[in-house]
Amino acid sequence: MGLQSAAAHFINRFIIWITIFMVACFLLRLLVVLDLNKRVYNHTPGPCRVLTDNYKGTAGMTYVESQKRVYITLGYGRAHDLKTKTGIAFYKTNRTDGRSQQEMYDLIEMTINWNGYEYKKEFIPTGIDSYSSSNGRVLLYVINAHPNHQCIHFFQIVESSKLNHRKAICDPSFSSLQDIAVVGPDRLFVTNMAAFGRGWAQILEFSLQTGQGAVYYYDGSKLSTAASSLIAPTGIGYDAKRRILYVGSMIRESIFAYKVAKDTTLELLYEMMLLTSPIGVFVESKTGDIWIAAHPVIHESAWHYTHPENQNIHSPSQILRIRIQEEGNSWVTTEPYANDGATISASSSVVFTDEQMLIGSSFGRLLHCDLTHSYIT
């Protein structure tokens, strides 16, 4: 009887110590994820200016080289119960078209012909990408972040500042759509960050790092899972020349590189550790350089996202540039821009072209910077 009692006592103590060890590991991982030890030091690549702060969010951007335009989604804050106008606008990057100094920094809002779409009032655009055909046709693909109508919307630019709504793809698996990367006409990848859309359930999911995120592929007729069991996938970008898909992970603070096969299946090539949480990804078509809009201090970002209406709560912003070397398996990372959140809070999108950089934010303004300090870019 004494031997059985001793064995039971040992088992109980063993279970207790294992439980303490697991809790300690969880707390340690949580502390690392929260970035409690990080600070942000402000710097810019050149003179910067605010293009607009009239909308609660400029969360997504895409560059159409044939038009010299950056298309921008407006009003993401409405998905977090902020009162704001939503829509799509564009910014002209061409500075030699005879416009005045003031006109060079204007945003032009687009009108949308919804063609009878039933839920047009629930349109909250966030992630956006584009496709340009050889005959000059430009298509836009936009994610709707409305909590009850998460869909992918298909548009065609029919006039200079008008959009024609073609269709919408919705699916029960769309719980927290984040970003979109187009690989062909009506062929695209999207990231779904988590099993839960928001709230404490999503926070718990991130804390446990359960890996419920996914990348979905739409081939023009049906939806399929391209990559599963991902931890908080966010921004996504496609390098058409190398056929590489880049997927950011907010919690792992890294970028995954996938080779896109001819049948559009994905093969994981490598993971690039960033030590910051990537939110938006932009790939330069000419160089293949990767530009990343990031949240460098995740606990401040989490507080900002749970209190977006509070103007006194900011989240730092950071832009990284990754230059992939010729051999393709090494890279150089620089930081062209960083801000403590006072100028632009929670950077979520970035575009670079013609020595101009545009930075969008989750709930606030759109920033434009001229890149004149080449030594930091």
Curated annotation (Swiss-Prot):
Tell me the gene name.
Answer: mec-6
Q: Which Gene3D superfamilies match?
A: TolB, C-terminal domain
What is stated as this protein's family in its record? Answer: Belongs to the paraoxonase family.
Bilayer topology: Single-pass membrane protein
This entry carries the following GO cellular component terms, namely: axon; plasma membrane
GO process annotations (BP): detection of mechanical stimulus involved in sensory perception of touch; mechanosensory behavior; positive regulation of detection of mechanical stimulus involved in sensory perception of touch; positive regulation of mechanosensory behavior; potassium ion transport; response to mechanical stimulus
Annotated glycosylation sites: N94
Q: Topological domains (Extracellular): residue ranges?
A: 35-377
Cellular location of this protein?
Cell membrane; Cell projection, Axon
Q: Which residues lie on this side of the membrane: Cytoplasmic?
A: 1-13
Query: Modified after translation how?
Result: Glycosylated.
Changing G235R: what effect? Answer: In u3; does not affect the expression levels. Abolishes amiloride-sensitive current. Completely blocks mec-4(d)-induced degenerations, and abolishes the punctate expression of mec-4 in vivo
**Keywords carried by this UniProt record:** Cell membrane, Cell projection, Disulfide bond, Glycoprotein, Hydrolase, Ion channel, Ion transport, Membrane, Neurodegeneration, Potassium, Potassium transport, Sodium, Sodium channel, Sodium transport, Transmembrane, Transmembrane helix, Transport
* Protein's name in the database: Mechanosensory abnormality protein 6
According to its UniProt entry, this protein's organism is Caenorhabditis elegans
What this protein is reported to do is described as:
Subunit of an amiloride-sensitive cation channel (degenerin channel complex) permeable for sodium, potassium, lithium and N-methylglucamine, and required for mechanosensory transduction (touch sensitivity). Interacts with degenerin channel proteins and stabilizes the channel. Plays a role in mechanosensory transduction (touch sensitivity).
Transmembrane intervals = 14-34
Indicate the quaternary assembly.
Component of a non-voltage-gated amiloride-sensitive cation channel complex (also called the degenerin channel complex) composed of at least the mec-2, mec-4, mec-6 and mec-10 subunits; the complex mediates mechanotransduction in touch cells. Interacts with mec-2, mec-4 and mec-10.
Entries under Pfam families matching the protein: Arylesterase
